[in-house]
């Protein structure tokens, strides 16, 4: 699939402040920098086994509409009421600047690549082009139905690489450091 054939790249992310969501957000930001229409799509929980995908998609849709609702409220009323914690609840893993959110699971299934982390069982978005990025050890090592036979597998580090799924040892590593982490906000303006 060439760049011209790719309509969108959707990166499935989960909302928590941890290394996996940060790296997925950083991947989204880097893909956007080089010209791809990459977006994050949040899921409220991991799929740990076979589930009814229709019911799970409804749960995901409700969750993303709730995030959208919080974003709209924050945009309209951020000066009137302190919505910083209210907004953070909806976008807790979006600390990497330069990303875009996919709120609805509506996309061209043939011309979209969906990137799933290793903790997502199956293909809940029903995409035809799936990339599995192993950011940690494979939690479904003994379950052949967890991943599709045509999925493209990559690992974050060689130690996390499942050799049966990725014998070529394809590795994609992205480093991210929050430059605002040690910034002091309580200091006055510096003079002299």
What are these regions (language model features)?
Residues 1-113:
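N-terminal pre-catalytic "stem/leader" segment of glycosyltransferase-like enzymes
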Residues 95-192:
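Catalytic core of nucleotide-activated saccharide and alditol-phosphate transferases
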């Amino acid at each position: 699939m060439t760049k011209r054939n790719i309509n969108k790249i959707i990166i499935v992310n989960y909302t928590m402040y941890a290394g996996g969501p940060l790296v997925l957000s950083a991947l989204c930001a880097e893909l956007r920098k080089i010209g791809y229409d990459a977006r994050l799509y949040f899921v409220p929980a991991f799929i740990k086994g076979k589930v009814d995908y229709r019911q799970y998609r409804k749960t995901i849709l409700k969750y993303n509409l709730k995030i959208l609702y919080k974003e709209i409220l924050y945009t309209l009323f951020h000066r009137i009421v302190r919505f910083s914690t209210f907004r953070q609840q909806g976008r807790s893993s979006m600390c990497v600047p330069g990303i875009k959110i996919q709120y609805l699971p509506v996309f061209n299934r043939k011309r979209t690549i969906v990137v799933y982390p290793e903790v997502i069982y199956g293909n809940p978005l029903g995409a035809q082009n799936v990339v599995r990025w192993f950011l940690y050890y494979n939690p479904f090592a003994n379950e052949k139905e967890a991943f599709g036979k045509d999925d493209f597998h990559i690992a974050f580090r060689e130690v996390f690489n499942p050799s049966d799924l990725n014998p070529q040892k394809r590795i994609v590593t992205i480093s991210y450091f929050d430059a605002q982490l040690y910034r002091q906000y309580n200091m006055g303006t510096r003079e002299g």
